[in-house]
A protein has these predicted regions:
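Conserved, function-defining micro-sites of small-solute handling proteins
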Residues: 36
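General beta-strand recognition
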Residues: 21-23, 50, 98
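Exported/periplasmic cell-wall-interacting domains
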Residues: 8, 28, 33, 42-48, ...
């Protein structure tokens, strides 16, 4: 447990991209803290959204702009250990952004994604079990 601003309600996810940390506020100015990978330069964002869907071992379909940048990527990948979304995914609003696991745990703490927030599979499984649909997510730069 770590201290956080008392301005956030219990159950809120606060993502600090500069710190490369995700906080799940538990109440009374306390939170669980997780390390994350964040968007690389040109792919960062800030704002408030909510968890709109949750998936275990999600399939992955790279967006068309990603396929243009990386034609070597598959057009679709079934969920599983090799899938870049990892063990769980929390979908953010109507965007293509997610909080998800990773098949590259060594990238946690780095700015490497296309705007999603990646966690170790162990951490995302824990977070997934703690948050319901509709959970408020605040992304700070």
């Amino acid at each position: 447990m770590v201290n956080v601003s008392a301005a956030y309600r219990s159950g809120t996810i606060v993502i600090n991209t500069n710190e490369r940390r995700l906080y799940l506020v538990t109440g009374s100015g306390q939170a669980l803290r997780y390390g994350i990978g964040v968007g690389r330069i040109g792919f960062t964002w800030a704002g408030t959204t909510a968890v709109s869907a949750k998936r275990e071992w999600p399939d992955w379909t790279p967006p068309s702009q990603m396929l243009r940048r990386r034609p070597d990527l598959p057009h679709h990948m079934a969920g599983g250990i090799e899938n870049p979304l990892g063990a769980r995914a929390l979908y953010l609003g109507r965007s293509m952004y997610r909080i998800h696991g990773s098949n590259e745990p060594e990238t946690i703490g780095q700015a490497v994604s296309s705007g999603c927030f990646r966690m170790t599979n162990e951490d995302v499984v824990d977070l997934y079990s703690r948050v319901p649909l509709g959970t408020r997510v605040v992304v700070l730069r």
